């Protein structure tokens, strides 16, 4: 898939408060995110993509969770990952876009109940929150999202973790 060109973050004229907020959010993950409000054409998504292109590459373990090599040992068992850590790769920080009509299952991921019933084992299909781990989650038109999806995003950001449970299985 061809990557579209990214407008340079430093070439955005004006919007100093927005640019500062984005920079601060990348420096301090404790901020948990930035809400940018503005009219169409005010460089909101351009700034986010431009900032992502500026961020340094990082090492991650290939797979749906984008774990760092340091995170892998503590998360491998809970996420049902191979005991032996795969070879890390170096990647650019991605921008994961949350579509307006997104469902809760698509955001959080889902437990495959068919596999649980048929094979007696848990199988989790990670969602967009897993894809956004160590990445930028971009939500355009947040006001058009279903309220329960917004609540889910806010809870996950505040808690720093997302737990999926279905019919007593988590």
Spans of features found by a protein language model:
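Conserved ASCE/P-loop NTPase catalytic core
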Residues: 2-170
């Amino acid at each position: 898939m061809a990557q579209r060109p990214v407008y340079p973050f430093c070439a955005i004229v004006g919007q100093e408060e927005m640019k500062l907020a984005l920079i601060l959010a990348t420096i301090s993950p404790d901020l948990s995110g930035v809400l940018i409000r503005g009219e169409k054409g005010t460089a909101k998504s351009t700034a986010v993509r431009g900032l992502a292109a500026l961020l340094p590459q990082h090492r991650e373990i290939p797979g749906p969770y984008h774990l760092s090599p340091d995170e892998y040992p503590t998360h491998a068992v809970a996420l049902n990952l191979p005991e032996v850590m795969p070879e890390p790769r170096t990647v650019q920080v991605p921008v994961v876009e949350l579509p307006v009509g997104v469902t809760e299952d698509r955001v959080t991921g889902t437990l495959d109940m068919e596999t649980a019933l048929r094979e007696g084992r848990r199988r989790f299909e990670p969602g967009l929150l897993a894809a956004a781990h160590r990445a930028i989650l971009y939500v355009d038109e947040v006001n058009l999202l279903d309220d329960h999806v917004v609540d889910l995003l806010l809870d996950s950001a505040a808690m720093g973790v997302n737990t999926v449970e279905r019919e007593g299985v988590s």
